[in-house]
Amino acid sequence: FLQFLHCPKSLWLLKRKPTLYEHGPFSNYLQKIITEGYEIEEHLKVFLSSQADGHKYSFQTVFKSSNGLFAIADCTRKNDDGSIDICEVKSSTSVQRGSPQNQIKDASFQRFAAEAAGFKVAGVFIVHLNSQYARDGVIDSNELLVFSDVTAEVDELIDETQQEIAAALLLLGTLDI
């Protein structure tokens, strides 16, 4: 979805003519970001395992809708009323709102995909690093992570996101551009 927002034709080429799509080099920076994301997710697992409601959390939850939307949430929490909270894990020290790493837009897509797949989403959170945390010995997962509630921001973007998703699906259904 974010690829569509950055360059629609690039997404079309990737999905419709993948043999012509040039992935480009896999940079050291990209590898670093991916590795850090997995490390943060591991710290989140440690943190949640120490919580009384830790059993309510699942990792890598897949949302697949009948109209072709597909998303994987880093973490979800099942609430007592049957709804879920979506937690997106990021290696940043704050919520990123600008391009190209607009975490709110990414979370908005995840929420839309989850709801299209039949889930009721109650809350959306970006889990990021605490910029005030200073490591002293063993990493303290309780102090390392911040859960930023971005539900209201996602709610504000959901109509815009729905229109962008419709445009992306329309483009992907086009045989030639």
Regions found by a protein language model. Give the residues of each.
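Metal-dependent nuclease catalytic cores that hydrolyze phosphodiester bonds in DNA/RNA
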Residues: 1-84
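Mg2+/Mn2+-dependent nuclease catalytic core
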Residues: 58-156
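Polybasic (Lys/Arg-rich)
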Residues: 162-177
